[in-house]
């Protein structure tokens, strides 16, 4: 949310979506945002902070008002300075969840390891931040109204050098995390399953393979690639 929040308008959106707007990103420095977070939460939305140059104090105000996560941590976010910790300082100091784009481009592998050490395995959520080009060949695509060029899997705005999301898939994110950290599948898998489910308060239904939960199953082969079986003989 890059405009001042309008809870009545958000209520209309939520009604039109049959209550399915579950997650929203806000920029803490936008006027009225910290004060509106409780109202967004009451509408059934989990609130993340991100796409922001907010200062430390304003970011903490949002966290204290109920923000539960940071959107693609480190990216599109004012970084830590020893005299001005900014939003990054509040995110690392707090116990909110941190999203991480683990494609090896948005975050250096060492940065991923640093984030895991700072927050712990139970507070990091691996995301893709993918655009429509995910899983497709290199070429020109659209991100909203902006043309995007994908070269060697790297998506950047056609006019400029800024990254425009990623082409990462969840399966590749899993393999990257295992490679970046040297940790086991069992240690890394919750970053893509349990943690997001817990953050969204749906862990009673999805996020792990337990009796009574939805059979939301992905089968991996020995190399941790998604195993798509062929048709029966």
Regions found by a protein language model. Give the residues of each.
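Short beta-strand/loop segments at the ligand-binding rim of alpha/beta enzyme cores
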Residues: 19-23, 41-49
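N-terminal active-site wall of soluble small-molecule enzyme domains
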Residues: 7-11, 30-39
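Conserved phosphate-binding/catalytic loop of the ribokinase/pfkB sugar-kinase fold
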Residues: 1-15
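C-terminal cap of metal-dependent C-N hydrolases
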Residues: 198, 208-233
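Active-site-adjacent C-terminal substructures of enzyme catalytic domains
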Residues: 36-39, 49, 58-187, 198-203, ...
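Structural motif
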Residues: 24-27, 50, 101, 191
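Glycine-rich phosphate-binding "P-loop"
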Residues: 1-4, 21-25, 71, 75
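Short, well-structured alpha-helical segments that form the helix of a local strand-helix-strand
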Residues: 185-196, 208-209
